[in-house]
Amino acid sequence: MENISDKIQKIRSEYGDKALVPEDLNSDPIQQFESWLADAIEVEASEPNAMAISTVDSENNPRSRYVLFKNIVNDSLVFHTHYESSKAKEINNNPNVSGIFFWPEIYRQIRFEGIASIADSKVSDEYFKSRPRGGQLSAWASHQSEEIEGREILEERIKELEKEFEGKEIPRPEFWGGYLID
């Protein structure tokens, strides 16, 4: 039986016809990003708005995870999270972040670095209102980066919240919102 190392070494892709042509690139990085993101969306890439974002913990260890990019505000990338999550705590301690979008379907990736800061509440409120009701309830129910005893605990919390907010607009929780990456 072939081991995983042998299998990995045999993986090959040809990129000759996918080369970047400098004349086709936009000198504005945000416009270039928007162009490639549009290309990824057009070919129905899997999760084209998923970005890996890296922070640094209190011991200066890098930590990466995927988040969903949701908007561009004044040339800043926007994502949303629980303000008590490990990523939020790390950003509050050291706002320098880096990340990458990878779209294998179009043979493109974009790497970025920047300073993360909490978005204006208007940005967070607008996005929260656009979320499906289930996503709004999940924001209230989930305490990111905290271990739970089982999925049934989370599901029970969502049922409680469904009753609490039945027939009402769900407000954005104060502990949840957006970050801008400049």
Spans of features found by a protein language model:
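Binding-site signature for planar aromatic cofactors or substrates
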Residues: 1-182
